Amino acid sequence: MAASLGQVLALVLVAALWGGTQPLLKRASAGLQRVHEPTWAQQLLQEMKTLFLNTEYLMPFLLNQCGSLLYYLTLASTDLTLAVPICNSLAIIFTLIVGKALGEDIGGKRAVAGMVLTVIGISLCITSSVPWTAELQLHGKGQLQTLSQKCKREASGTQSERFG
């Protein structure tokens, strides 16, 4: 199935929402280590209260969930073999970029090389699924179908000669 430009852009937006919010969620949830309650149920409730009353956590969380909703809606019309690599691979790249912007250490030259290779791989995935590539593939399939039909005709002609 060929992917439209809108579908690819929606998947890139999902990756940006998922990956871009991860460093923000990590930073905003740093205060959870200070929450200590006697039972696991009280601990859970206090942690939820701490997180959801913190707007620094809540805003990235809601954006992240919007990414999940968009992903779910996009999957209805997008090939899964395209959606998963785009979203997951690019989310990692967006996480590294936003993390670097926030002052985190992302790993130097190897991380940058990994990002470049990931973008090249995703570009190949996208290129192989765009409509013009699909038309070329259909053209090739048409040639294979013609060859297949020719073989069938020759085979049926050979059989009729045997029985005729």
UniProtKB/Swiss-Prot annotation:
The chain crosses the membrane at residues 1-21, 82-102, 112-132. The keyword Nucleotide-binding does not apply. It is found in: Membrane. One of its GO terms (cellular component) is membrane. It is a multi-pass membrane protein. Keywords: Membrane, Transmembrane, Transmembrane helix. Its main location: membrane. Belongs to the TMEM234 family. This is Transmembrane protein 234. It comes from Homo sapiens (Human). The gene is TMEM234.
